[in-house]
Every structure is written in C-alpha cells, then in structure tokens.
Amino acid sequence: YTLNYSFTTAQEIMQGLLAGKVDHAVLGEPFLSIALRKDSTLQILADLNRPDSVSSGFAQTAILYAPAIKKSQKAIDSLLHLSCRFAVEQPEQAIRILEKEKIFASGMLTPESIERCKIDYRTASEAQENILRFLQLIGQYEPKALGGKMPDEKFYK
C-alpha cells in the first residue's frame, strides 16, 4: 500500500472517491457528508476526530488576535464558546444561519456533519497540551513550519 498525494485539496479527494480513482482517503467535513450523500456505498472506516482514553484529539483551528483587539480576548473567547455550543446544540438553526450568510453553500452541511466535527471551543491555555502535541507532530515532519522551535509560554496566553 502506497500513499498518493496527487490529490491536493479536499474537493479533489472527494471527487477522486466519487470517480473511483481513490479507494481510501482521509476526508474532513463538509466534504465527507457530501461524498456520503452522493455515493451511499462509501463507508466511514475510522473517526479520527473521536477523543478517547488513548487520544484526547488535537487542535484543528486557531483563532489569532490582532494586537489591537487583544484586550477584548476574554469577551471574544466567551462569544466563540457560545457560538460553538449553539452549533452543537442547535445544528439545524446553525446551518440555516451559515447558509444565509453564504459561509457554506446550501446543502453542504447536515446535522450529522456538525456532529462529526466534534466542535469544542477551548482557549489556547485550556488546549495547551493538545496544541503542543500537534506542534510536536508538525515539528517531526517539517520543523521549518515552526520556525525551527516550539512556542514559549506567551503563545498560550
């Protein structure tokens, strides 16, 4: 079994699956849900986003603050936490808002796709261990991506 990186975007991977050019793939949302809707024979073999006793998951997205709004960080963190809880607790309404605001095209998201995302907002200090583990993984394969060193404690504040 060899790895094939000739498909470089999630959309290309999804199209490769649907065209039968790809047998196995790691595919994130919303492309996973779109592929499952278009081809009912596709199956999820593993959920890489399921924290368990062995792995607590890893940070997938970072929110960066411009220095000018750093003073509002607590309020922004609170709003982001509430927004994420809203998406988890009321996925249909969240989908309507995301579609209305043209963040996602109509039909791209489903309540199942939101559930599979395991949305859980944490501040950098709350997620420090997971962030560090993720950065160490990146550092193993591409140290230049980290500027050759791990961030110091100020990074998590």
What spans do the regions from the language model cover?
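Surface-exposed patches in mature extracellular/periplasmic domains of secreted proteins
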Residues: 5, 87, 94-98, 146-151
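Pocket-lining segment of extracytoplasmic ligand-binding domains
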Residues: 11-98
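Secondary-structure end/capping motifs
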Residues: 71-141
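Conserved C-terminal helix/tail region of periplasmic/extracytoplasmic solute-binding proteins
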Residues: 132, 136-157
